[in-house]
């Protein structure tokens, strides 16, 4: 994998790593990419009929507890106006 793709991935993730951690990340990232490439070589025929279910067998939606905006703000220092800001992707 080209170094530029790895550098861009690290930049977009907003993660700062030491050189040792970066080397570990690159090694693991390359393994994942190789596995994805290997999986993409399989020929799979999709059978939509096999996935059909009656509506009555589907689960009901339940309203569950969620984090408050204040708790979410604490997860990142790039939270602005209700959104997480991210690096510019398109140049």
UniProtKB/Swiss-Prot annotation:
Taxonomically, which superkingdom?
Bacteria
**InterPro entries attached to this UniProt entry:** Asp/Glu-ADT_sf_sub_c, GatC
GO molecular function terms noted in the UniProt entry? asparaginyl-tRNA synthase (glutamine-hydrolyzing) activity; ATP binding; glutaminyl-tRNA synthase (glutamine-hydrolyzing) activity
Q: What EC number is given for this enzyme?
A: 6.3.5.-
Task: Please name the NCBIfam families in this protein's record.
Answer: gatC
Q: Which family does it belong to?
A: Belongs to the GatC family.
**Name used for this protein in its record:** Glutamyl-tRNA(Gln) amidotransferase subunit C
Organism of provenance: Borreliella burgdorferi (strain ATCC 35210 / DSM 4680 / CIP 102532 / B31) (Borrelia burgdorferi)
The uppermost taxa in this organism's lineage are:
Bacteria, Pseudomonadati, Spirochaetota, Spirochaetia, Spirochaetales
């Amino acid at each position: 994998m080209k170094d530029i793709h790895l550098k861009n991935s690290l930049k977009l993730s907003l993660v700062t790593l030491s050189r040792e951690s970066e080397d570990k990340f690159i090694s693991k990232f390359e393994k994942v990419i190789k596995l994805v490439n290997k999986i993409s070589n399989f020929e799979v025929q999709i059978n939509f009929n096999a996935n059909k279910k009656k509506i009555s067998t589907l689960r009901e939606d339940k309203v569950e507890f969620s984090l408050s905006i204040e708790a979410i703000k604490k997860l990142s220092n790039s939270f602005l106006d209700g959104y997480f800001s991210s690096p510019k992707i398109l140049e």
